[in-house]
């Protein structure tokens, strides 16, 4: 049994896969298995992954016979893993040199279910560079230890929560396999991180945020649309995926075989809902053209309750109005624009 299993779901974008895998296999720490799950790619991902498997016996390739989404790919890989610890990586990211030994040493010395470590954001373009500092702050864990019900209580809290990505975390192996055994057999893409983080947070006994641990190389802007404007269709798709994840979270919370038992499901589900609506509205505000905002808002309202969406609109009104009121020169272009936006919303 290897000390560590690393699961990498792969769908197209094969050009990044070798660097991802080699960032693991070229490390001094050797007691690791790498499980690549090819989700029925339409490019040469299977061939590239097969070559990586041929090069190193620690690499194992599993291929789906149909495209099933990220949740299913991660579930396949984790349930096939054998490691004492388990990690998940995205195929276009990497690990810093020496990260594996540091994580294993920390895990062996500090028993826990979830080990949350930090990132180095590698910006692929100008938009990514502009977003890098904020993303680094968001993905960097506080140095703390949480236990039992406090883990999920903190996870989605707006004041002291932690991010819901499943990568840049190491999990106790049996714990991760149990968590993914609870995962629904539904297609879910992108929003599966939040869904699984809720399950992890529910089942975990101990969470540790590791200080000074920028060991996950997060490639921001690679292969995504960071910095480009959204369309009405894309904002609707995003809201639909998030709403689907929230529905699946609710289904999980209704199960009668979840241990440990808890009596705060309503509050925890409210936390998740509020964070998802905040996310949708921030994307609407920041990345949807003004000409599409009205239609985009109507699409968001088909997935989320009007009172919560109005609460986010009020937040924008408050912020723009405050910026106008405290401006040194209320006749400046910036102040006038803030007043205009406050009135508009």
Where are the model-predicted features located?
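Donor-binding/catalytic cores of nucleotide-activated saccharide
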Residues: 91-212, 216-235
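Catalytic core of nucleotide-sugar-dependent glycosyltransferases
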Residues: 205, 214-222, 228-260, 279-307
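A conserved acidic beta->alpha catalytic loop
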Residues: 23, 38-47, 66
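Short beta-strand/loop segment that forms part of the nucleotide-sugar
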Residues: 31-40, 60-64, 90-91
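Glycine-rich, basic loop-to-helix element that forms the pyrophosphate-binding segment
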Residues: 64-81, 88-94
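Membrane-interface aromatic/basic loop that binds lipid-linked glycans or pyrophosphate carriers
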Residues: 276-345
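Short, well-formed alpha-helical segments that are part of the catalytic scaffolds
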Residues: 12-26
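Cell-envelope/extracellular polymer assembly enzymes that use nucleotide-activated donors
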Residues: 2-5, 33, 195
